Amino acid sequence: MADRLTQLQDAVNSLADQFCNAIGVLQQCAPPASFSNIQTAINKDQPSNPTEEYAQLFAALIARTAKDVDVLIDSLPSEESTAALQAASLRQLEEENQEAAARLEEVVYRGDALLEKIQTALADIAQSQLRTRSGAPSQQTPPES
C-alpha cells in the first residue's frame, strides 16, 4: 500500500484526468450553438440529450474525487506536531513493528515444522507405494514424535 503522499498524488492525478475527460466528452457531444436563437428553457427534470447525462456523471466523479483529496489532505500530519510527538509516534510504530515481526517469526517456525511433517508423511507414502508395486512386504515404520 502506498503512503499518504503517494495516495494524494494519485488522487490529484485522477482528478486532473477526470477534468480532461469531462471536457473532451462534453466538447465531442455538444451540439453546435446557434447564436441567433438562444434557447434557455430546458426541462430540468429529465436530460434532453446525452450531454447532460455526461455532465451529471462527470460532476459526480469530480466531486467524489475532490472529497477523497480533502480526506487525504486532512489525514496528513499537521505542521504543529512537535518533534517529541513525532518521536513518540515513531517509537510506538517501532514497538508495533517488533511485535508483528515476532508473530511472523513464530508463524514461520510453525509453518516450517508443519512442512517437515508433511514431507515426512509424503516420503512414507511414496515408500509404501513403491513397496506395494514391487510386491515386497510392507514394513510399518514407527511414527516419529
UniProtKB/Swiss-Prot annotation:
Coiled-coil parts of chain: 79-112
Protein name, entry field: Mediator of RNA polymerase II transcription subunit 21
Keywords: Activator, Coiled coil, Nucleus, Transcription, Transcription regulation
Organism: Danio rerio (Zebrafish)
Gene: med21
Record text on subunit structure and interactions: Component of the Mediator complex.
Function text: Component of the Mediator complex, a coactivator involved in the regulated transcription of nearly all RNA polymerase II-dependent genes. Mediator functions as a bridge to convey information from gene-specific regulatory proteins to the basal RNA polymerase II transcription machinery. Mediator is recruited to promoters by direct interactions with regulatory proteins and serves as a scaffold for the assembly of a functional preinitiation complex with RNA polymerase II and the general transcription factors.
Chief localization: nucleus
Family listed: Belongs to the Mediator complex subunit 21 family.
Gene Ontology molecular function, alphabetical: transcription coregulator activity
InterPro entries reported in the protein's UniProt record: Med7/Med21-like, Mediator_Med21
One GO CC term, this protein: mediator complex
A matching Pfam family: Med21
